[in-house]
Amino acid sequence: MQKNILVRSIAALSGIVMLASVAACGDNTATTTDNSSSSDSTSKSTPISGNFSGAGASSQQAAVEAWIAGFQGTNPEAKIAYNPSGSGAGVQTFLTGATAWAGSDKALADDEVEQSKSVCTEGTAFDVPVYISPIAVVFNLKGVSDAGKHINMDAATIAKIFDGKITKWNDPAIADQNKDLKLPDTAITVVHRSDKSGTTQYFVSYFEDVTPDNWTYDLSENWPNEVGQGAKGTSGVISTVKQADGTIGYADFSQVGDLGTVAVKVGDKYNEISAEAGSKVIGDSKQDDTVKGDNRIVIKINHATEAEGAYPIVLVSYDIVCPAYKDTKQAEFAKAWLTYVTSDEGQKAAQDAAGTAPLPSSLKSEITKSIEAIKTK
């Protein structure tokens, strides 16, 4: 996701800022910040000071910028840099010990948990959910999107469109769900990500869980078929959809702008996308109890939710940290950072900056327990 952000170099961290890697979602603009607004959620007894860096998911970029500003309100001597190099690159950098934390759109793999023993002085690295963002099915259709109207679709219809099985906007499968709309006989042009993308994986996992008969591809961060045209990054998808009538794509909700969005069928209703609706599906989901390692909070999204008002297509992004660090200052920072980021104040800052969904209250006690596991002495 992209924002107009102020980038200021910090010499002590230039090695991290200049990491050359490919973003999982969006562009690779490194973010550093050294002054801020106030925060009441960060540790007040001992302000954090020093230079700290993270790298990873570009989906988090705008939120991280807001979090840095908020964190530094009560920790003005903390100099923080974040390189949105992509989830995979960020995790690998963290596993070399070069960063205090990684941002990732997917949970650690078993081999990455094992590898973390080389950088964590005790135990293994763990993931904490910090960022929830609804994924919009966006479209550009004359007379509909430009009139501010939604189009209703169930999972099977969306899957068939993105698999090239439905090719006209007035196809009966769409028209029967939108009897109040006059849909044109316009060809559908699918726009998908051309780059490796966590957003893609979360998007197609919805099909895999809800309508598997209509989506038979292996789950991957790469787009699996030759339907439509590819575009790099969230901005590329949005730009391409805007350019032509009849287009449809998928993108982080914060980037939708004035494009039309699909209201997705949940139970017997069609729910429009919103931050709050995205949070509801996470509140109706469970933790994945199959992951290895202590203190990990990995969400198994309940795409088949029937929760009132829930929007089922969402991305969950994590911060990955150690339970113990060689440098005590790193541990103190990681603990204070996660405490702020997952607080009500931190989540509100992310929502204001990036349109994210807040962490549901049902997760708060587990998140606090995991953060408390970080040893600072």
Features from the language model and the residues they span:
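N-terminal segment of the mature folded domain
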Residues: 28-29, 34-35, 40-175, 238-240, ...
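Extracellular/periplasmic juxtamembrane helices and adjacent flexible linkers that interface
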Residues: 44-49, 178-186, 301-377
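C-terminal motif of bacterial Sec signal peptides marking the signal peptidase cleavage site
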Residues: 20-24
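Periplasmic-binding protein-like
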Residues: 124-139, 263-318
